[in-house]
UniProtKB/Swiss-Prot annotation:
Protein name in UniProt: Extracellular calcium-sensing receptor
Phenotype upon loss of function: Heterozygous mice show benign and modest elevations of serum calcium, magnesium and parathyroid hormone levels as well as hypocalciuria. Homozygous mice show neonatal severe hyperparathyroidism, had markedly elevated serum calcium and parathyroid hormone levels, parathyroid hyperplasia, bone abnormalities, retarded growth and premature death. Mice lacking both Casr and Pth survive to adulthood with no obvious difference in size or appearance relative to control; they however show a wider range of values for serum calcium and renal excretion of calcium.
Region (Ligand-binding 2 (LB2)): 189-324
Xref: PROSITE patterns: G_PROTEIN_RECEP_F3_1 (PS00979), G_PROTEIN_RECEP_F3_2 (PS00980), G_PROTEIN_RECEP_F3_3 (PS00981), G_PROTEIN_RECEP_F3_4 (PS50259)
Organism: Mus musculus
Topology term for the membrane: Multi-pass membrane protein
Lineage: Eukaryota, Metazoa, Chordata, Craniata, Vertebrata
């Protein structure tokens, strides 16, 4: 088995030596050998391998000048180290460098050479081989370029723990140490580059891009990382395509069609130059311009793409370049290259031919004749000349390298070349650490050190992982746990050189991976030249920017970057472009007309200064003034009959409550505060209840006095002044209790209402409890209803007491106002709620004031003749006569029915005649006037002791039984004469009938003396007279003052019933008669 392994190793080495001839490698002996993998060519020639004969090795095509420069950088670094006394003294580094042709197959051929040589060296087969010279093991490999190539190489080298230090492979997949154990690199991870690309797109506010990636281990992971970063930044990708340098024409055209039809103007490309070149050629052929290319580092400075004939397509490209380094002496080293001097560099011959477009004869020592063409195979060589060199002129060998412009001499921005230089020095410093290792301080078991003369690849890998040194630029070089060397990026922009028309790469910014997020990117926009030589940033968005005041609205079925601009709703705003959502204004603010900002809402309430508030205030003040004026009039004329008849004390209290009603309306005007909200409803409710309570007590007392059948001492006791005030207090106290409960359980408070109107804040009072408010108004209306009932019943009282009629009107007004108030209150909002209540308060208050008091004030001020005791007595007597007359007219029908039942004759139909004459012309004789003036009012005791006096009649009519009642005033006499055509035998029936009739008359007598109970009338068969002394006529609500004494010379009106069952009025003048007739 051992011999079988030896044979495999020998076969691999033999095969590899035949595959790579002398012209296909750069090699130099040394104590320690470093391997190198560089893309000297961009690809290989496609051949149809039909396997009819032995397959031949593919031929590399399309020379890569930058690849040759990178190779030169490795050779320069090795020679510089060999000449340095400080680094690896007494040791020489050698190299074996192969061309990968930018393909995996060629790279693996070279890698097999490294692995096979190491295997042979480890087997120590020199004693079995007839070898002319010993080739040491390759302890480290520098390369490769593309991530796909490096991935394949790393898988193979990792099996033998041969360290691989790449200078250009940036795929993030290579950071996986579980798979790529021996891989390290001097270029940053693509993860940072993808993040930087997304940051650039976000910086220019682009959100609609396309992506193109090479279909390899470099393009796919890179573009996948970009997608992740783009999604975090709300960047949408319109299309995503994969390309390769081996893609056929149809595939390339399909990708170009997608690019041409897309609305995305920015295209992100993760690819190498060779993979992208076929696509760019087709785009140039179709002349598709106006695109912004965002280039990854692999092609950002590619000479295949950065060609002047492509500039109208790729001009303005933004790319990422590695940080340029300084390599002292490298420029001179590049200029010294010559095929006859570079004996260890087998690639120099082809470089010379490609640079000067000539053919260099093999083995030539001097210049060859110009214009000599070679059409056959050269001696000593088996290589078939390709079409690019077959008909070239021979090279003289004296060509000047500085006379031509090639990427090889672009040494101003050394990026990849510096990475190669740094990779070589990293390996050298690892070897230096081994060389200077002291026993006990080593990295191996028990602190042991490796032997530099017998060093193995895995030992170098161990030291590379712990490497830490300072390079020639003063930077610290160390590999992280993933084998990556963190670095920064330069941002370059493709310009057209005005000097020679070539494409130059202008540095317009940088990306610092060490900085904080948001501070990593710096771009100088003034230096950027966009496609078409424009200085304006191109637009690459699916939708136009949404200006301030709008937001982005999602379009169904489209990516999130494709949106429509939706205006912010009222109450919301957006102060920036492309806002994803509108911000809601604070509660006290509202959006302006353009929805770009918030402005303070208008605050509205029933203000003192607005016209409506001024009008209501003036009406309230007018009401207060009128009420105060009426109160003043009543106080000034407090001793007049009209004022006395209205119960002065309750009238004063009623006017005071009206003052409070008018004043309470002012609490509803002005900005509501907590204290005004808690005061206004109770003030309104208590004031109105006090007012209505006064009216209720007055009205009810008048009704009870005038309709009481027997006004006994019980009535006089309980309807005194104190009881009246007590009833007013009790009615008002109930309202006070309601208000206290309301304020304790749910007190009203000021409230800023934002919901009624969007742009206005209504400052109103929150009532706390609608039930409490309803109870307050309901109790007020209940008292008003009771008051209305009694007032309606009292509407026909004497004229001087007919304020009940006006109270009825005022209550009607009150109900109309408050019934209208309820729907108006419920249907209004804002300040109009307060206005409606103020109007209701004022209307009800004016109604009460006008109906109850204006008529009296008018009489007091403008009709003083009606403000006399005679007027009051006449009105009272008229009411009494009307009641008595009604009772008298009803009685004959009753008597007739009773006579019929007893078998008596039917009485004649009563007739009546009414006449009005002076006292001297009375048809019926008047009783003699009393010689002594009687007191107008008697004490309670005197009223109880004084009997009714019977006086003889002045005229006798014996043929008719006659019962006569005579009522004597201090100023005259009123005589009631009642007669019936009844037989003598029915005297007892007559007596009973007269007693019943006297009860009807007592209703009238009650109006004459309400403080004195009337005894039943005493009637005999003969006429009789009853005289009652006048106690003075007073208003129905007054009980604490003495009436004035009138002169006895004036005769008061009298009602006299004749023998023919008619009645006449005696005395009082025609006006009284007319009033009675009217009644």
């Amino acid at each position: 088995m051992a011999w079988f392994g030896y044979c495999l190793a020998l076969l691999a080495l033999t095969w590899h030596s035949s595959a790579y001839g002398p012209d296909q490698r750069a090699q130099k002996k040394g104590d320690i050998i470093l391997g190198g993998l560089f893309p000297i060519h961009f690809g290989v020639a496609a051949k149809d391998q039909d396997l009819k004969s032995r397959p031949e090795s593919v031929e590399c095509i399309r020379y890569n000048f930058r690849g040759f420069r990178w190779l030169q950088a490795m050779i320069f670094a090795i020679e510089e180290i060999n000449s340095s006394p400080a680094l690896l003294p007494n040791m020489t580094l050698g190299y074996r460098i192969f061309d990968t042709c930018n393909t995996v197959s060629k790279a693996l051929e070279a890698t097999l050479s490294f692995v096979a040589q190491n295997k042979i060296d480890s087997l120590n087969l020199d004693e079995f081989c007839n070898c002319s010279e010993h080739i040491p093991s390759t302890i480290a490999v520098v390369g490769a370029t593309g991530s796909g190539v490096s991935t394949a190489v790393a898988n193979l080298l990792g099996l033998f723990y041969i360290p691989q230090v790449s200078y250009a492979s940036s795929s993030r997949l290579l950071s996986n140490k579980n798979q790529f154990k021996s891989f390290l690199r001097t270029i940053p991870n693509d993860e940072h580059q993808a993040t930087a690309m997304a940051d650039i797109i976000e910086y220019f506010r682009w959100n609609w891009v396309g992506t193109i990636a090479a279909d390899d281990d470099y393009g796919r992971p890179g573009i996948e990382k970009f997608r992740e970063e783009a999604e975090e930044r709300d960047i949408c990708i319109d299309f995503s395509e994969l390309i390769s340098q081996y893609s056929d024409e149809e595939e390339i055209q399909q990708v170009v069609e997608v690019i041409q039809n897309s609305t995305a103007k920015v295209i992100v490309v993760f690819s190498s130059g060779p993979d992208l070149e076929p696509l760019i050629k087709e785009i140039v052929r179709r002349n598709i311009t106006g695109r912004i290319w965002l280039a990854s580092e692999a092609w950002a400075s590619s000479s295949l793409i950065a060609m002047p004939e492509y500039f109208h397509v790729v001009g303005g490209t933004i790319g990422f370049g590695l940080k340029a380094g300084q390599i002292p002496g490298f420029r001179e080293f590049l200029q010294k290259v010559h095929p006859r001097k570079s004996v260890h560099n087998g690639f120099a011959k082809e470089f010379w031919e490609e640079t000067f477009n000539c053919h260099l004869q093999d083995g030539a020592k001097g210049p060859l004749p110009v214009d000599t063409f070679v059409r056959s195979h050269e001696e000593g060589g088996n290589r078939l000349l390709n079409s690019s060199t077959a008909f070239r002129p021979l090279c003289t060998g004296d060509e000047n390298i500085n006379s031509v412009e090639t990427p090889y001499m672009d040494y101003e921005h050394l990026r990849i070349s510096y990475n190669v230089y740094l990779a070589v020095y990293s390996i050298a410093h690892a070897l230096q650490d081994i060389y200077t290792c002291l026993p006990g301080r080593g990295l191996f078991t028990n602190g042991s050190c490796a032997d530099i003369k017998k060093v193995e690849a895995w030992q170098v890998l161990k030291h590379l992982r712990h490497l830490n040194f300072t390079n020639n630029m003063g930077e610290q070089v160390t590999f992280d746990e993933c084998g990556d060397l963190v670095g920064n990026y330069s941002i370059i922009n493709w310009h057209l050189s005005p000097e020679d028309g070539s494409i130059v790469f202008k540095e317009v910014g940088y990306y610092n991976v060490y900085a904080k997020k948001g501070e990593r990117l710096f771009i100088n926009e003034g230096k950027i030249l966009w496609s078409g030589f424009s200085r304006e940033v191109p637009f690459s968005n699916c939708s136009r920017d949404c200006q301030a005041g709008t937001r982005k609205g999602i379009i169904e079925g489209e990516p999130t970057c494709c949106f429509e601009c939706v205006e912010c709703p009222d109450g919301e705003y957006s102060g920036e472009t492309d806002a994803s959502a509108c911000d809601k204004c604070p509660d006290d603010f509202w959006s302006n007309e353009n929805h770009t900002s918030c402005i303070a809402k208008e605050i509205e309430f029933l203000a003192w200064t607005e016209p409506f508030g001024i009008a209501l205030t003036l009406f309230a003040v007018l009401g207060i003034f009128l009420t105060a004026f009426v109160l003043g009039v009543f106080i000034k004329f407090r001793n007049t009959p009209i004022v006395k008849a209205t119960n002065r004390e309750l009238s004063y209290l009623l006017l005071f409550s009206l003052l409070c009603c008018f004043s309470s309306s002012l609490f509803f005007i002005g900005e509501p505060q907590d204290w005004t909200c808690r005061l206004r409803q109770p003030a309104f409710g208590i004031s109105f209840v006090l007012c209505i309570s006064c009216i209720l007590v007055k009205t009810n007392r008048v009704l009870l006095v005038f309709e009481a059948k027997i006004p006994t001492s019980f009535h006089r006791k309980w309807w005194g002044l104190n009881l009246q005030f007590l009833l007013v207090f009790l009615c008002t106290f109930m309202q006070i209790v309601i208000c206290i409960i309301w304020l304790y359980t749910a007190p009203p408070s000021s409230y800023r209402n934002h919901e009624l109107e969007d742009e206005i804040i209504f400052i109103t009072c929150h009532e706390g409890s609608l039930m409490a408010l309803g109870s307050l108004i309901g109790y007020t209306c209940l008292l008003a209803a009771i008051c209305f009932f009694f007032a309606f019943k009292s509407r026909k009282l004497p004229e001087n007491f007919n304020e009940a009629k006006f109270i009825t009107f005022s209550m009607l007004i009150f109900f109309i106002v408050w019934i209208s108030f309820i729907p108006a209150y419920a249907s209004t909002y804002g300040k109009f709620v307060s206005a409606v209540e103020v109007i209701a308060i004022l209307a009800a208050s004016f109604g009460l004031l006008a109906c109850i008091f204006f008529n009296k004030v008018y009489i007091i001020l403008f009709k003083p003749s009606r403000n006399t005791i005679e007027e009051v007595r006449s009105s009272t007597a008229a009411h009494a006569f009307k009641v008595a007359a009604r009772a008298t007219l009803r009685r004959p029908n009753i008597s007739r029915k009773r006579s019929s039942s007893l078998g008596g004759s039917t009485g004649s139909i009563p007739s009546s005649s009414i006449s009005s004459k002076s006292n001297s012309e009375d048809r019926f004789p008047q009783p003699e006037r009393q010689k002594q003036q009687q007191p107008l009012a008697l004490t309670q005791q005197e009223q109880q002791q004084q009997p009714l006096t019977l006086q003889p009649q002045q005229q006798q009519q014996p043929q008719q039984p006659r019962c006569k009642q005579k009522v004597i005033f201090g100023s005259g006499t009123v005589t009631f004469s009642l007669s019936f055509d009844e037989p003598q035998k029915n005297a007892m029936a007559h007596r009973n009938s007269m007693r019943q009739n006297s009860l009807e008359a007592q209703k009238s007598n009650d109006t004459l003396n309400r403080h004195q109970a009337l005894l039943p009338l005493q009637c005999a068969e003969a006429d009789s007279e009853m005289t009652i002394q006048e106690t003075g006529l007073q208003g129905p609500m007054v009980g604490d003052h003495q009436p004035e004494i009138e002169s006895p010379d004036e005769m008061s009106p009298a009602l006299v019933m004749s023998t023919s069952r008619s009645f006449v009025i005696s005395g009082g003048g025609s006006s009284v008669t007319e009033n009675i007739l009217h009644s």
